[in-house]
Amino acid sequence: MAEIRRQPFQTVKVDIEEMDRKIREHRIRMLKRAGIVLGILILLWFLLYIYHQVRTYDSHEAKVTEDRQDSAANTYLEFQGNILKYSNDGAFYTDTSNELIWNQSYEMSDPVVVMSAKYAAIGDEKGTLVYIFDKDGLCGKIETTKPIVRVKIAEQGTVALLLEENGVSYLKLCDKTGKTLAEGELHVENSGYPMDIALSKDGKQFAVSMLDISDGTIKSSIAFYNFDSAGEKKIDHVVGTKKYSDIIIPQIEFLENDNLIAVSNQKLMLLEVSGKPQEKKSIKYGSRLRTFFYNGKYIGLILDNESSSKEEKNDVYCMQIYDNRGALVKEKTFSRTYRKAEFLNNNEVCLLNDNECTIFTLRGVEKYHEAWDKSIYKVLPGR
């Protein structure tokens, strides 16, 4: 023990630089491994995405079936992930398992439905009633004294109406409870006959397409209204008008970026309305326009196919998809017979015939086609 006590206390000299080097090397190795793993995951995700984009289907498997207890007069729409069914005598809102969420009775001769992300309005064309709903049920009701010609709805539930009586047209703007926000007469002798109306996403901008043939020639115009500060000092809130000769504009729609799309018999026009309305882009059809459809993000045209390409010349139709800036996303020729074309909620294109369904991706891939043994009324994307 004495000898042990006589031994001097010893310390171990630590090489700090060597330890730092080893720590750095370890970190680099771990970062490389993490980078490799991340790269593999990204590659797998990309391959899976491509696989789903190009994968095709020609059949289906029914997981749940439900016999219809209603008549063929009922129309089905998707609304906030559930199903809105409406007819002349009422509306029913159910989940995808057919469990009732709410219902509303009414009497309409020609009901039409317009929807935004959170609200739906059911109006009686040529009648005087409009009901406004959200996912929980009735929000408000509008009763007019003049027949309804058009109904449009904004994101916050604001409803725009085009009314007509004895050859005189009127505009009416209401909030989601049915309270009147603005209304007035359209002077046809000054601007023509109204063809369509459009309401912006925020409900602050409004447009009317007019047709004038009073002097024996065809003239069209689009009048723009602003109910925000930009239109406060303007007469009747009109902030601008675009005029066109020798074309008819039967349909106008606001897109998600608040640009306006005008569908004429000769071309498609994209107008910017944030300031003074001006035309940003014009797309000539090149052949006969068969169908126009849109969903706010994308615009779809189906035209007669006049391609001389060996691979495409035998196809009957040419489908063109544009984004809301007017840029061409995809052009695809096809020969499938259809009676209706629309975008699904996942932006895929659905073509419906009486008992046939065809679905195209935005890449132009025919993802699904099948002929059913029963009539198809509506296709909704699964969750």
Model-found features: residue ranges?
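N-terminal Lys/Arg-rich, disordered targeting/topogenic segments
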Residues: 1-31
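A short beta-strand motif characteristic of beta-propeller blades
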Residues: 55-68, 98-105, 136-143, 180-187, ...
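Short beta-strand elements that form the blades of beta-propeller/WD-repeat-like
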Residues: 74-87, 91-92, 113-125, 130-131, ...
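Short loop/turn segments that connect beta-strands within beta-propeller blades
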Residues: 95-97, 134-137, 174-179, 227-230, ...
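Structured, soluble extracytoplasmic/luminal domains of envelope-associated proteins
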Residues: 101-155, 278-306, 317-318, 328-333
